[in-house]
Amino acid sequence: MRMIDIIEKKRDGHTLTTEEINFFIDGYVKGDIPDYQASSLAMAIYFQDMNDDERAALTMAMVNSGDMIDLSDIKGVKVDKHSTGGVGDTTTLVLAPLVAAVDVPVAKMSGRGLGHTGGTIDKLEAIDGFHVEIDEATFVKLVNENKVAVVGQSGNLTPADKKLYALRDVTGTVNSIPLIASSIMSKKIAAGADAIVLDVKTGSGAFMKTLEDAEALAHAMVRIGNNVGRNTMAIISDMNQPLGRAIGNALELQEAIDTLKGQGPKDLTELVLTLGSQMVVLANKAETLEEARALLIEAINSGAALEKFKTFIKNQGGDETVIDHPERLPQAQYQIEYKAKKSGYVTELVSNDIGVASMMLGAGRLTKEDDIDLAVGIVLNKKIGDKVEEGESLLTIHSNRQDVDDVVKKLDSSITIADHVVSPTLIHKIIIE
């Protein structure tokens, strides 16, 4: 088999066999196939696309290029959730203890965040003493006993994806549905998931700006999952404004605690219940999405979800008293109100810009080596559709420096107030095939 033949075959719009895809991935990981040939094939895929069989084969070739996490010692169906990323996305912190409270095992591998705020692990490390460096045996034991544990990413998972992702980044082949879908799904499958729930974001603060693109990606990932024996569902949710009200690590953790108490923002609560219902159904703990939702609402109302979060924190060395004493979380030195310059209705909150503003305060990382300030960030006091009076606070800046002129300047261009009401949509579609 020759790589040049595979490139030409895809260039001319033909279907690659599983053997050809395996030959490419194996050779590329070993270093036998050079970057220039790999980038040539990536560009051919970009223009000619791949069918469902090719996408599934590419995904599994990437899964098989490295280690796979074995979660077979954990009882029950392990359901993993993946979000394509957004601003203020606190869902994992709420979902993990919530679905665990209705007997769904959550064995979560998480990374540290690059971008606007930290990842799930950074947020959890805002809790004094919380640690994620636990060995596999302890991880399995904690999930079996309490249904939920979070561990830092380890092992050599999907090396082919890491290599191909870096190549796509510099060759103009990032925005390709088969390449994005196989990249995301290979990581989830390698991490040991039996079933997968996907939250595909669309809008100004999302990777997929249009609903059409988000739908294409969601269908692609659901089909890959189902084709390789992992029950998969997706929802398409809106990221034209940040989710919830908090953007920042300790601030988002506080918001997660409020949501588990039943006092969280409406949009975050609704998204969590929608995603959680799918997880409960896929884990065979309810027959319908309606039944699953009722179980989750009961877990919040009874306090079971909050109790589960407390035990989870305690199990991993954290100070669980932060649940009842949120003032023990890292606090920023200064709270600065950003006020409306005129009266009207909020019609636009540019997610990315607000995320960048939060990053400028120190809430996120530009490189893996950067330190994060867990206390800082932004809390939205108004969201799209809300009425606002001139001089009223639109948001609160939590900062450890007094001079935030650069942040204010960024925010000036990210908020629009007009004299008409806009009603945002939170959940656009649910995709099951």
Curated annotation (Swiss-Prot):
Superkingdom of origin: Bacteria
Binding site for substrate: R168, K187
Gene3D superfamilies associated with the record: Nucleoside phosphorylase/phosphoribosyltransferase catalytic domain, Pyrimidine nucleoside phosphorylase-like, C-terminal domain, Transferase, Pyrimidine Nucleoside Phosphorylase, Chain C
Keyword Hydrolase: no
Reactions that this protein is recorded to catalyse: uridine + phosphate = alpha-D-ribose 1-phosphate + uracil; thymidine + phosphate = 2-deoxy-alpha-D-ribose 1-phosphate + thymine; 2'-deoxyuridine + phosphate = 2-deoxy-alpha-D-ribose 1-phosphate + uracil
Cofactor: K(+)
Protein family membership: Belongs to the thymidine/pyrimidine-nucleoside phosphorylase family.
Name of the protein: Pyrimidine-nucleoside phosphorylase
Source organism of this protein record: Staphylococcus aureus (strain MSSA476)
Encoding gene, per UniProt annotation: pdp
